[in-house]
């Protein structure tokens, strides 16, 4: 079986100044193609460290994807380090120099002399085309491994992996030994609670379970390695879903917002949103997905009591009698949001995100959520543990999404979430 590794370069990645989303995307994409990464290494912009890691990992891997360090500045050292690791010189690749000159001409810019560095490759390198940028990809054989060099710019990396890297490894290696993955997204239960339900199950050989906590969700990953295990994966996944019941909110989706987006897109139904404590988070997460304009009619942030009254038509007496964070208020918010454009559904939130503003009766983490439909309104008050402001908002958004998801599936809209908090009418 091919052994695949990844080397991520850059001081900003190593020091935590930026989150390495390239590595996460690459690993996920490879898994979608049935290919598993065995190791990932991060190294800074130091020539001797890069040389050492290229030499050491090339003794163990069959293919190594190297990401970053192909730019025109002094801290871009990947090509130089690869040449030194193999005992070669850097030579100008005339084809890539012409590409650079043409690229700058097309963009009506004068090419800086520093960009010529991007055409300098190790002597034995095979150029890998990058039609969407100026960084030249290349691959070099060192010891047992092919090292495949890619730019750090995310969309350039993605293009090169899809168009160059995956076809190369499929042609070069026997990839019969496959890995498959199913992902179940849950809310409202902690890892230990989920594990207590799953771990008594007898799993077939080749199938393993992993957990990833990323509040407000916990993702359950079901890995299947080998043809027999892959064939059994749907049955095992179905059994786990049955055991977990209402805790599972999506399958093979990264977020609950993505699940809602897909369901609304396919249903032709419309949604409006009125947000107070979530401050536009529900709307923003849906707008992240292309095509959301086909179902999302409007998103209103009605933070003040005055805006709740004047924009959504909340009765001032409701606010006086029950307060902004209450079932009656949030129900009127949802009804008002739905009525504006006669949407099929409307979600509304009003709560105390903290860190201040709570009372003994309504502490920080108290959130009222409502879903208005053409036939009526569902509502609930959740009392979240005292956590960060962002987490209270994201948990509230997740519960709102799940209420809508359950309505779309004609399931019970109001359910108990163990770890999110207790509920009251």
UniProtKB/Swiss-Prot annotation:
InterPro entries: CinA (IPR050101), CinA-like_C (IPR036653), CinA_C (IPR008136), Competence-induced_CinA (IPR008135), MoaB/Mog-like_dom_sf (IPR036425), MoaB/Mog_dom (IPR001453). Disulfide bonds: none annotated. SUPFAM superfamilies: CinA-like, Molybdenum cofactor biosynthesis proteins. It comes from the Bacteria. Belongs to the CinA family. This is CinA-like protein. The lineage of its organism: Bacteria, Pseudomonadati, Pseudomonadota, Gammaproteobacteria, Alteromonadales.
